[in-house]
Curated annotation (Swiss-Prot):
Cofactor(s) needed by this chain: pyridoxal 5'-phosphate
Domain of life: Bacteria
Reactions catalysed, as given in the entry: (1S,2R)-1-C-(indol-3-yl)glycerol 3-phosphate + L-serine = D-glyceraldehyde 3-phosphate + L-tryptophan + H2O
SUBUNIT field: Tetramer of two alpha and two beta chains.
Provenance organism: Sinorhizobium medicae (strain WSM419)
Record PTM N6-(pyridoxal phosphate)lysine, positions in chain: 99
Name this protein carries in UniProt: Tryptophan synthase beta chain
Family: Belongs to the TrpB family.
Enzyme class: lyase
Known pathway: Amino-acid biosynthesis; L-tryptophan biosynthesis; L-tryptophan from chorismate: step 5/5
Length: 406
């Protein structure tokens, strides 16, 4: 789990109220507050419990398959003709993405708290699959809320969840995407507080979720840091990751925040362009507000109503962002940029053909930014990118767009 920060660190948040500057906090229904406080207390005990850490590490090694490899993308580097490009291969984890890191940690907490039922929300389906997987592993029933639009575009993951024994509940409200699924999951939680643990998949939601998810995902950056020192004898010049709610990104960013020589870039879903509403670039084009229990940057209209947003990638299709990212953006430690659907699609194809790796559409956004930046950097410079998920789930979406369907 995450290493303790130094004084005057970018890594010391959140405060006792769960705030990162003006962001974060706990904005929940009165009925949920006792549960949130119980979770906070249990988390405080667990993270200082050697037995909890040992079990987490054991499952990480033998069930998830950690450490994930650090891979030098030799052909991509040669093709772009600039900085050396390394991938942190989170898509090689059990279930095919970074999501399992957090799910294993949280299911251990749920067991400690005596909960007998798991609920989760999912967009791309990767968190749903990871939640259903750990629920099966620990013998707990699992209900996954998923927007009806996402159920349609992520059919392979829906089937996986059902095979794993989870009940998948399509949500037709709104645009039927991740925001709507999260709303339904919160409604379920309010009515089943005694038995149910809500396994949130991203670094958002009410405190302690953003901190907890970050700490479970920080294994990505901790490993990558060590692996980079072994491979190159130094840290990278640039770290890049895709940002939806922001869990894979904060996982790789956080261990590097206090390393001043490392530039950090988060890549948002620019969708069809920032001039309309067909994007999910909360930091680039949003404004502060409250959603799903925390204050952060949101896509909202003048009346504070949440916009639906759009991305080719179901996992980035969220009109908000984790509060720690909002804070890192405002203090200028991390730069956040948008990438359009067509750029991500092109990057998806480039990686597939040059390296024989089919990436998910989420990290394809990060890759598109790497493809832009690498040629402008020196050959002695190094880029580290989080390859957060594999693209099996996206092949039908991509095939349809490229006219390569059956």
């Amino acid at each position: 789990m995450n290493q303790p920060p130094k004084p005057n660190s970018f890594r010391s948040g959140p405060d006792e109220e769960g705030r990162f500057g003006i962001f974060g906090g706990r904005f929940v229904a009165e009925t949920l507050m006792p549960l949130i406080l119980d979770l906070q207390d249990e988390w405080a005990r667990a993270k200082n419990d050697p037995a909890f850490k040992a079990e987490l590490e054991n499952l990480g090694r033998h069930y998830i398959g950690r450490p994930s490899p650090l891979y030098f993308a030799e052909r991509l580097t040669a093709e772009l003709g600039g900085a050396k490009i390394y991938f942190k291969r989170e898509e090689l984890n059990h279930t095919g993405s970074h999501k399992i890191n957090n799910c294993i940690g949280q299911i251990l907490l749920a067991k400690r708290m005596g909960k007998t039922r798991i609920i989760a929300e999912t967009g791309a389906g990767q968190h749903g699959v990871a939640s259903a997987t750990v629920a099966a592993r620990f013998g707990l029933p699992c209900v996954v809320y998923m927007g009806a639009t996402d159920v349609e575009r992520q059919a392979p993951n829906v089937f996986r969840m059902k095979l794993l024994g989870a009940e998948v509940k399509p949500v037709t409200a709104g645009h039927g995407t991740l925001k709507d699924a999260m709303n339904e999951a919160l409604r379920d939680w309010v009515t089943n507080v005694d038995s149910t643990y809500y396994l949130i998949g991203t670094a958002a939601g009410p405190h302690p979720y953003p901190e907890m998810v970050r700490d479970f995902q920080a294994v990505i950056g901790e490993e990558a840091k060590q692996q980079m020192l072994e491979a190159e004898g130094r840290l990278p010049d640039l770290v890049v990751a895709a940002v939806g709610g922001g869990s894979n990104a904060i996982g790789i960013f956080h261990p590097f925040l206090d390393d001043g020589g490392v530039r950090i870039v988060g890549v948002e879903a620019g969708g069809k362009g920032l001039d309309g509403d067909e994007h999910c670039a909360s930091l680039t084009a949003g404004s502060p507000g409250v959603l799903h229990g925390n204050r952060t940057y949101l896509l909202q209209d003048g009346d504070g109503q949440i916009k639906e947003g759009h991305s080719i990638s179901a996992g980035l299709d969220y009109p908000g962002i984790g509060p720690e990212h909002a804070w890192l953006n405002d203090i200028g430690r991390v730069e956040y940029v948008p990438i359009m659907d067509h750029e991500a699609l092109e990057a998806f194809q480039i990686l597939t053909r040059l390296e024989g790796i089919i990436p998910a559409l989420e990290p394809s956004h990060a890759l598109a930014e790497v493809i832009k930046r690498a040629p402008k950097m020196g050959k002695d410079e190094i880029i580290l990118m989080n390859l957060s998920g594999r693209g099996d789930k996206d092949i039908f979406t991509v095939g349809k767009i490229l006219g390569m369907g059956q």
